[in-house]
């Protein structure tokens, strides 16, 4: 019986008429596939109910953040919001590859009108006035509302005390009825666009007037305190960011120092005052662009568990505390760290001895702030007494520790808000190319001061250039007279005058090409040619200086030599060896002849050493020859002429030594010192000694030579116009 019932049921399932009955019962908006299913865009049981599925309501943000959803019976479509444009069809659905992209309205010319600037935002844009102009609508406005940027009538207001006072009072009056949080929000908004000097002053005064105490914020929620502190940090950033430097520089230096100090002091104190609103341990960080802040609030007994340090963009600071004698665990303690990335230029180091005397370069150049300014403050030092502060600051410009002097300093200011940099209580612990580490025994605003050897030399660049030009003109005149002398007078012709003559010719060519071609860098090939000629003739001059030293050494030591053989070798060495060096250098690195600024050898890949190397070698050889010659001459005079006093002997040798220094080119050793130390002193010594080398050679080899004096006497004696002068 059971089997008969099962067979009957199974056969009913296989009955095709049954499937037909099911499909006939489906809703008009449903499809039949064994069962009734509502079509896409509808929802229900498929038989009695298939109503429209409103995707715009059931799937939040189905079209994405930048599009509107429009529902219709059985479906939906998306449209981009105003301020966005579709990269496909105007109407689209999710996941069909279409997206909404921001329209940059600022690409349209003069979108905001004359004397204004367009700022594109995601989905919109906004306008602000250019510096020197103002709008009745405020710092930000939309165009086509009758708003024009007109010339700011108060652009010079900061120079007049009465005008400044009126503007400050007007600003304060507008904020009289605002709460602390509302005031800081308004200041942030008003300072977010370009400011004039008088507005910088006005909004700093507005911030200072926001007197805070714990009662003002104790009832605020954590979120409200966070928002207020954020508005404070952004307001400070708006006042000191890089774009505002040009306006700060228009303010009198003393007044500028006063208001910057006031701002630093207020930012620190108000942040600590606002942190009193936190009822639980809190960590907070605000990044506002050029100003960043980190804040820690905790109970005093938890101080050891909380890191009293901050690391911000490669700058770090850490506080070391000691145990309080009378511990007070009531209330909370806050520690705030503030870093100002661009304020250093506004706090120019004073010329007081406490700062300026630290550098051996300071007397010749400017001391600069070469780091961000970092500040640290504690709300209650009685519960958290300070031991010391250690910090590492990143240099604004990389330094050479061997040439640039850095010191750890802090901004010391009085209750009258007048401040200056001081070194008291701070020591430098470590320095490298990019960072300086310090340790101080107090809290305040810290920075790294630097006196740069290169910066000092730049200050003397024009003077050194004029000395070089004048010296070379004088040297060229003197060298031409030397060449005439050694070439014209036959009675003085010998090996020594031949060497003198070739040395003078090489120096003349080198200095002449230097004078007319060193700055001709506009045409690369011509500049490379000038650099190659300078390389050759300066090396030739050094080679003949070396020959001077060797020849004098042979004479003093008393070596007998073949004059003809020696002459041939002298010429080969004097002109051949420089040619070999230049040929090899040009083959291996021809592209390093000439730079974008001067027609000389490039320092890339140490190519400059193709000149410095041979020059240093010759200087060392001549220094050795110089020492031997002076020693031999002194001993010879002492033995052969005992009647001459020791003092006279030394004085005679000194005169000869000075002459030899210039003839042998030993003064070029100042160039080596300049490369090693690059100080103002070595720059002047090198410039004076070498641009006037031709003049000194003329004085010592011609003017002070008795034989040449006699030759000139005979020459002028035969000239009637000059004879009377010689009588």
Swiss-Prot record:
<dbReference type="InterPro" id="IPR000203">
    <property type="entry name" value="GPS"/>
</dbReference>
<feature type="transmembrane region" description="Helical; Name=3">
    <location>
        <begin position="536"/>
        <end position="556"/>
    </location>
</feature>
<feature type="disulfide bond">
    <location>
        <begin position="112"/>
        <end position="127"/>
    </location>
</feature>
<dbReference type="InterPro" id="IPR032471">
    <property type="entry name" value="GAIN_dom_N"/>
</dbReference>
<keyword id="KW-1003">Cell membrane</keyword>
<dbReference type="Pfam" id="PF01825">
    <property type="entry name" value="GPS"/>
</dbReference>
<feature type="domain" description="EGF-like 1; calcium-binding">
    <location>
        <begin position="52"/>
        <end position="90"/>
    </location>
</feature>
<feature type="topological domain" description="Cytoplasmic">
    <location>
        <begin position="631"/>
        <end position="654"/>
    </location>
</feature>
<feature type="disulfide bond">
    <location>
        <begin position="408"/>
        <end position="438"/>
    </location>
</feature>
<feature type="topological domain" description="Cytoplasmic">
    <location>
        <begin position="557"/>
        <end position="568"/>
    </location>
</feature>
<dbReference type="Pfam" id="PF07645">
    <property type="entry name" value="EGF_CA"/>
</dbReference>
<protein>
    <recommendedName>
        <fullName>Adhesion G protein-coupled receptor L4</fullName>
    </recommendedName>
</protein>
<feature type="topological domain" description="Extracellular">
    <location>
        <begin position="518"/>
        <end position="535"/>
    </location>
</feature>
<keyword id="KW-0812">Transmembrane</keyword>
<dbReference type="GO" id="GO:0005509">
    <property type="term" value="F:calcium ion binding"/>
</dbReference>
<dbReference type="GO" id="GO:0004930">
    <property type="term" value="F:G protein-coupled receptor activity"/>
</dbReference>
<dbReference type="Pfam" id="PF00002">
    <property type="entry name" value="7tm_2"/>
</dbReference>
<feature type="transmembrane region" description="Helical; Name=7">
    <location>
        <begin position="683"/>
        <end position="703"/>
    </location>
</feature>
<comment type="similarity">
    <text>Belongs to the G-protein coupled receptor 2 family. Adhesion G-protein coupled receptor (ADGR) subfamily.</text>
</comment>
<keyword id="KW-1133">Transmembrane helix</keyword>
<feature type="disulfide bond">
    <location>
        <begin position="426"/>
        <end position="440"/>
    </location>
</feature>
<keyword id="KW-0677">Repeat</keyword>
<dbReference type="InterPro" id="IPR018097">
    <property type="entry name" value="EGF_Ca-bd_CS"/>
</dbReference>
<feature type="domain" description="GAIN-B">
    <location>
        <begin position="282"/>
        <end position="456"/>
    </location>
</feature>
<feature type="topological domain" description="Extracellular">
    <location>
        <begin position="20"/>
        <end position="467"/>
    </location>
</feature>
<feature type="topological domain" description="Cytoplasmic">
    <location>
        <begin position="489"/>
        <end position="496"/>
    </location>
</feature>
<feature type="transmembrane region" description="Helical; Name=6">
    <location>
        <begin position="655"/>
        <end position="675"/>
    </location>
</feature>
<feature type="domain" description="EGF-like 2; calcium-binding">
    <location>
        <begin position="102"/>
        <end position="139"/>
    </location>
</feature>
<feature type="transmembrane region" description="Helical; Name=5">
    <location>
        <begin position="610"/>
        <end position="630"/>
    </location>
</feature>
<feature type="region of interest" description="GPS">
    <location>
        <begin position="408"/>
        <end position="456"/>
    </location>
</feature>
<feature type="topological domain" description="Extracellular">
    <location>
        <begin position="590"/>
        <end position="609"/>
    </location>
</feature>
<comment type="function">
    <text>Orphan receptor that plays a role in vessel formation.</text>
</comment>
<feature type="disulfide bond">
    <location>
        <begin position="56"/>
        <end position="69"/>
    </location>
</feature>
<dbReference type="GO" id="GO:0005886">
    <property type="term" value="C:plasma membrane"/>
</dbReference>
<keyword id="KW-0732">Signal</keyword>
<dbReference type="GO" id="GO:0007189">
    <property type="term" value="P:adenylate cyclase-activating G protein-coupled receptor signaling pathway"/>
</dbReference>
<dbReference type="InterPro" id="IPR001881">
    <property type="entry name" value="EGF-like_Ca-bd_dom"/>
</dbReference>
<dbReference type="InterPro" id="IPR046338">
    <property type="entry name" value="GAIN_dom_sf"/>
</dbReference>
<dbReference type="Pfam" id="PF16489">
    <property type="entry name" value="GAIN"/>
</dbReference>
<keyword id="KW-0245">EGF-like domain</keyword>
<keyword id="KW-0106">Calcium</keyword>
<comment type="subunit">
    <text>Heterodimer of 2 chains generated by proteolytic processing; the large extracellular N-terminal fragment and the membrane-bound C-terminal fragment predominantly remain associated and non-covalently linked.</text>
</comment>
């Amino acid at each position: 019986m059971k089997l008969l019932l099962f067979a009957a049921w199974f056969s009913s399932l296989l009955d095709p008429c049954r499937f037909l009955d099911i499909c006939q019962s489906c809703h008009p908006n449903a499809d039949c596939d064994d069962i009734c299913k509502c079509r896409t865009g509808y929802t229900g049981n498929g038989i009695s109910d298939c109503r429209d599925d409103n995707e715009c309501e059931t799937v939040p943000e189905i079209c994405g953040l930048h599009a509107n959803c429009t529902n219709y019976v059985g479906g939906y479509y998306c449209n981009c919001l105003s301020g966005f444009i579709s990269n496909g069809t105007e109407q689209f659905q999710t996941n069909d590859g279409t997206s909404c992209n921001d329209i940059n309205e600022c690409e349209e010319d003069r979108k905001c009108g004359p004397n204004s600037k367009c700022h594109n935002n995601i989905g919109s844009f906004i306008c602000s006035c250019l510096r020197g102009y103002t709008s009745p609508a405020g710092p930000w406005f939309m165009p086509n509302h009758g708003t024009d940027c007109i010339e700011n009538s108060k652009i010079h207001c900061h120079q007049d005390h009465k005008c400044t006072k009126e503007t400050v009072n007007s600003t304060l009056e507008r904020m009289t009825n605002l709460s602390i949080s509302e005031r800081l929000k308004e200041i942030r908004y008003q300072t977010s666009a370009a400011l004039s000097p008088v507005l910088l002053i006005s909004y700093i005064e507005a911030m200072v007037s926001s007197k805070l105490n714990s009662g003002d914020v104790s009832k605020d929620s954590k979120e409200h305190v966070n928002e207020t502190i954020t508005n404070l940090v952004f307001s400070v950033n708006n006042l000191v960011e890089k774009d505002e430097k040009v306006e700060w520089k228009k303010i009198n230096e003393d007044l500028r120092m006063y208001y910057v100090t006031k701002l630093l002091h207020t930012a620190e104190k108000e942040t600590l005052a606002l942190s009193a609103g936190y009822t639980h341990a809190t960590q907070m960080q605000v990044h506002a662009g050029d100003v960043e802040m980190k804040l820690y609030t905790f109970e005093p007994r938890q101080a050891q568990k909380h890191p009293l340090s901050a690391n911000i963009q490669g700058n770090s600071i850490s506080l070391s505390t000691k145990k309080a004698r009378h511990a007070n665990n009531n209330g909370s303690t806050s520690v705030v760290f503030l870093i100002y990335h661009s304020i250093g230029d506004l706090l120019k180091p004073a010329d007081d001895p406490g700062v300026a005397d630290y550098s051996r370069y300071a007397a010749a150049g400017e001391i600069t702030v070469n780091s961000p300014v970092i500040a640290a403050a504690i709300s209650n030092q009685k519960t958290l007494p300070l031991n010391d502060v250690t910090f590492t600051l990143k240099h604004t410009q990389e330094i050479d520790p061997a040439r640039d002097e850095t010191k750890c300093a802090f901004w010391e200011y009085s209750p009258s808000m007048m401040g200056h940099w001081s070194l008291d209580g701070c020591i430098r612990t470590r320095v490298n190319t990019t960072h300086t580490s310090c340790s101080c025994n107090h809290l305040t605003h810290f920075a790294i001061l630097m006196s740069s050897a290169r910066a000092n030399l730049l200050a003397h660049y024009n003077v050194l250039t004029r000395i070089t030009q004048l010296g070379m003109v004088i040297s060229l005149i003197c060298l031409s007279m030397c060449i005439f002398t050694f070439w014209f007078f036959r009675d003085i012709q010998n090996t020594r005058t031949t060497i003198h003559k070739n040395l003078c010719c090489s120096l003349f060519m080198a200095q002449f090409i230097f004078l007319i071609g060193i700055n001709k860098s506009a045409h690369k090939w011509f500049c490379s040619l000038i650099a190659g000629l300078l390389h050759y003739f300066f090396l030739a001059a050094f080679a003949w200086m070396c020959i001077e030293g060797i020849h004098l050494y042979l004479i003093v030591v008393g070596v007998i030599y073949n004059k003809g053989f020696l002459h041939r070798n002298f010429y080969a060495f004097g002109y051949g060896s420089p040619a070999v060096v230049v040929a090899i250098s040009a083959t291996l690195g021809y592209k390093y002849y000439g730079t974008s600024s001067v027609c000389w050898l490039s320092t890339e890949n140490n190519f400059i050493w193709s000149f410095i190397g041979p020059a240093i070698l010759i200087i060392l050889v001549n220094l050795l020859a110089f020492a031997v010659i002076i020693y031999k001459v002194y001993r010879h005079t002492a033995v052969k002429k005992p009647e001459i006093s020791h003092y006279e002997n030394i004085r005679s040798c000194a005169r000869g030594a000075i002459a030899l220094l210039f003839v042998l080119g030993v003064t070029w050793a100042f160039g080596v010192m300049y490369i090693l130390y690059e100080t103002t002193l070595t720059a002047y010594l090198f410039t004076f000694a070498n641009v006037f080398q031709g003049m000194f050679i003329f004085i010592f080899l011609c003017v002070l030579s008795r034989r040449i004096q006699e030759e000139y006497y005979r020459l002028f004696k035969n000239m009637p116009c000059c004879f009377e002068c010689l009588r």
